[in-house]
Swiss-Prot record:
Gene designation per UniProt: recX
Function: Modulates RecA activity.
Name under which the protein is recorded: Regulatory protein RecX
Gene3D superfamilies listed in its UniProt record: Winged helix-like DNA-binding domain superfamily/Winged helix DNA-binding domain (1.10.10.10)
UniProt-listed InterPro entries: RecX_HTH_1st, RecX_HTH_2nd, RecX_HTH_3rd, Regulatory_RecX, WH-like_DNA-bd_sf
Lineage: Bacteria, Pseudomonadati, Pseudomonadota, Gammaproteobacteria, Enterobacterales
Stated family: Belongs to the RecX family.
Organism: Enterobacter sp. (strain 638)
Length: 166
């Protein structure tokens, strides 16, 4: 006769899942809540955890209390990661907003980060269009559109030609 193990309480299962999720990389609270609420793929297919809203709140509080969840650390690392991938401040702000980070926390982290956005914009333009950067109007417009899409501010884009005319 096969004896099945009794199911662990929903809180314990949620807590295990939260620690596993946060062990891979930092998440915002909103991201963690979304991932915890998603069904778990088990041996018998997708399976929802029958947890209450109080269970989710307790897990989130535990994660904050034990420093598994830290929005300041998440924002700082996210800005560094996205800037290394060549994205500008406007795009990064928008992505952080989508992840549920408060605007004031985002702005404070953007002020504290040590990134020269003008230099980063120039590096992205050179990587895409080569050195020296084209000086024809139509090519400048292409570069401008590309950098705006990547999230750079117009003043940083215009500074490329103003400061690096060589």
């Amino acid at each position: 006769m096969s004896e099945s193990k009794p199911r662990r309480p929903a809180y314990a299962r949620l807590l295990d899942r939260a620690v596993r999720i946060l062990g891979v990389r930092d998440h915002s609270e909103q991201e963690l809540r979304r991932k915890l609420a998603a069904p778990v793929i088990g041996k018998n297919g997708p399976e929802a955890i029958d947890a209450t809203e109080e269970d989710y709140d307790r897990v989130i509080a535990w994660c904050y209390e034990h420093s598994y969840l830290d929005d300041t650390r998440f924002v700082t690392r996210f800005i560094a990661s996205r800037s290394r991938k060549g994205y500008g401040p406007a795009r990064i702000r928008q992505e952080l907003n989508q992840k549920g980070i408060a605007r004031d926390a985002t702005e404070q982290a953007m002020r504290e980060c040590d990134i020269d956005w003008g230099e980063l914009a120039r590096d992205q333009a050179v990587r895409k269009y080569g050195e020296p950067l084209p000086s024809e109007f139509s090519e400048k417009v292409k570069i401008q559109r590309f950098l705006l899409y990547r999230g750079y501010l117009m003043e940083d884009i215009q500074a490329i030609w103003r400061n690096f005319t060589d």
